[in-house]
Amino acid sequence: MSEVEKKEEETTTTTTVEKTEEKKEETSSFAPAAEIKEYAADVEPNVEYEATLKRDVVEVKTNEENEDTLFEIRAKLYRFDTDPSPQWKERGTGNVRFLEDKDSKRIRVVMRRDKTLKVCLNHHISPALSLGEMTGSDKSWVWKCPKDFSDEEKPEGVEELFAIRFATPENAGLFKTEFQKCQAKNEAIEKKTE
């Protein structure tokens, strides 16, 4: 390589280094800390928001307003489905409650699904109902209901076979005790009305 070529190469590298340093200086957007503190002290944030759409308050009715909760416990509900092949199908998970009407004093059992709050169990606790043990589990009970009103498509009620499962055998025992107490109360009310 000749001396001329070496000098040209050196000048090109120096000019490129100088240009990149200039670009770095131009693109640097950091301000000194003192300037930032001054600016921050002068600025007051405006965080007031107003709703763009005004809505009316809607009263939600659950048809449980005229009832007192006597008992409530978490459980998983199943119903026996015979079509197309006989099997237990999950109806929902949530809190099962015994509700007493303030006027008539009749007690019904109601269960709503957790997230949707859709009713998955709704019938009166009749003295004719028989709560039986589910085979192979000490945490579950089975009973046949002549008319369950939880299905919106069949408001006249439908006959169902239910199974309910609890987290512990103690909870299952509590449920059975309360169920039988409610049956006795409803039986006494039915005898008074006859």
From Swiss-Prot:
Residues 1-10, 18-27 have a biased composition (Basic and acidic residues). Pfam families: Ran_BP1 (PF00638). Belongs to the RANBP1 family. One of its GO terms (molecular function) is small GTPase binding. GO terms for biological process: nucleocytoplasmic transport. It comes from Dictyostelium discoideum (Social amoeba). InterPro entries: PH-like_dom_sf, Ran_bind_dom, RanBP1-like, RanBP1_RanBD, WH1/EVH1_dom. This is Ran-specific GTPase-activating protein homolog. Residues 1-36 are annotated as: Disordered. Residues 42-188 form the RanBD1 domain. One of its GO terms (cellular component) is nuclear pore. SUPFAM superfamilies: PH domain-like.
